[in-house]
Amino acid sequence: MADVVVGIQWGDEGKGKIVDRIAKDYDFVVRYQGGHNAGHTIVHKGVKHSLHLMPSGVLYSQCKNIISSAVVVSVKDLCEEISMFENLENRLFVSDRAHVILPYHVQKDAFKEKSQNIGTTKKGIGPCYEDKMARSGIRMGDLLDDRILEEKLKVHFKAIEPFKEAYDLNETYEKDLREYFEQYAPKIRPFIKDTTSMLIEANQKGEKILLEGAQGTLLDIDLGTYPFVTSSNTTSASACVSTGLNPKAINEIIGITKAYSTRVGNGPFPSEDTTPMGDHLRIGGAEFGTTTKRPRRCGWLDLVALKYACALNGCTQLALMKLDVLDGINEIKVCVAYERRGEKLETFPSDLKDCVPIYQTFKGWEKSVGVRKLDDLEQNTREYIRFIEEEVGVKIRLISTSPEREDTIFL
């Protein structure tokens, strides 16, 4: 059986810590979408690990780690992450169906961002997915055979010829790209496998599989705050599509949310706090992007968005992250509805323009940092947790009270 860990905000919810915390109970940890535009930070034995492509189970020797077919892969960045760890042979597997990000994709991404101003990381993620959908991309499996790779490169060079000048590709681009693959393909080849068959077989054998999403539900290309979204499907449903596991293989769906809200980049954010309180949350929560180092926009928990995300994913339980960041705040706000042009909205609309948050205020608490038992939390803290559970209709089974792995309350 497989369990899914999915972010139910705009990403950066703390999925890495949760996967790292529970990975010891699984045989496989699988990253199922996105690219190195996403980052997750794991603190293990006091050491901070910032990962972008590598599944979070890499710190557990018994875990097999898979990068599955809907992930887009920068082979250069993956090689750099591989070099951070030892003994990854037979522990890391990259789907032969996953698509490869090319330098051209990065150039195109930067060019488009100048005019669209979506707030992308300019890592080439979107253009790589574009080529995938146009059925013209290069896949990881193509790197296993030099002849096939050369054929794919010739098609690629022909396709981009009209755009070389626009995307600032120099005269040596073809030579440089061939040298790029000559450098990195041999390092990656030992890890490229048919992960779809591997996971189907593992599921049939009853092995435990943890499916790890990137970004968050509200950045989903179809169901998020379009056009300020990522280029992949970020909901739990995409875990099946990417891995080849059928929906009946899914057991628990664990939704990850912070005790407040953040967003990086542009796009609507109704509960954003632009007063010094927003700065307080940013500093207290160390809210700076793992990938871009950009400061995240911060605000109060948005239950309208949270209920929407839980419904989309079919969450069976929640993990509440960074509760300790709210320590010492006298009054804590929660967005319970929106007002838009005189109308009260309790459901999440496709367009958040003109949506103003309606808040409910709670008394704050002194301290929760480092607490590992529910009974040790102050009454006001427990009331805040209970309110979230009741409003969303999903039980909170895990609460994080610091970045450290052990500072976790299991319910």
Swiss-Prot record:
Domain of life: Bacteria
Cellular compartment(s): Cytoplasm
Binding site for substrate: 290-296
Pfam families membership: Adenylsucc_synt
Annotated Mg(2+) binding sites: 12, 39
GO cellular component annotations of the record: cytoplasm
Broad class of enzyme this protein falls into: ligase
Residues involved in GTP binding: 11-17, 39-41, 296, 322-324, 400-402
GO term, biological process aspect, one: IMP metabolic process
EC number: 6.3.4.4
Catalytic activity: IMP + L-aspartate + GTP = N(6)-(1,2-dicarboxyethyl)-AMP + GDP + phosphate + 2 H(+)
Pathway where this protein functions: Purine metabolism; AMP biosynthesis via de novo pathway; AMP from IMP: step 1/2
Cofactor, how bound (note): Binds 1 Mg(2+) ion per subunit.
Gene Ontology MF: a single term: magnesium ion binding
Keywords: Cytoplasm, GTP-binding, Ligase, Magnesium, Metal-binding, Nucleotide-binding, Purine biosynthesis
Main location: cytoplasm
Cofactor(s) of this protein: Mg(2+)
Active site: 12 (proton acceptor), 40 (proton donor)
Binding site for IMP: 12-15, 37-40, 121, 135, 215, 230, 294
Family: Belongs to the adenylosuccinate synthetase family.
Role, per record: Plays an important role in the de novo pathway of purine nucleotide biosynthesis. Catalyzes the first committed step in the biosynthesis of AMP from IMP.
Subunit structure and binding partners: Homodimer.
Protein name: Adenylosuccinate synthetase
Species of provenance: Helicobacter acinonychis (strain Sheeba)
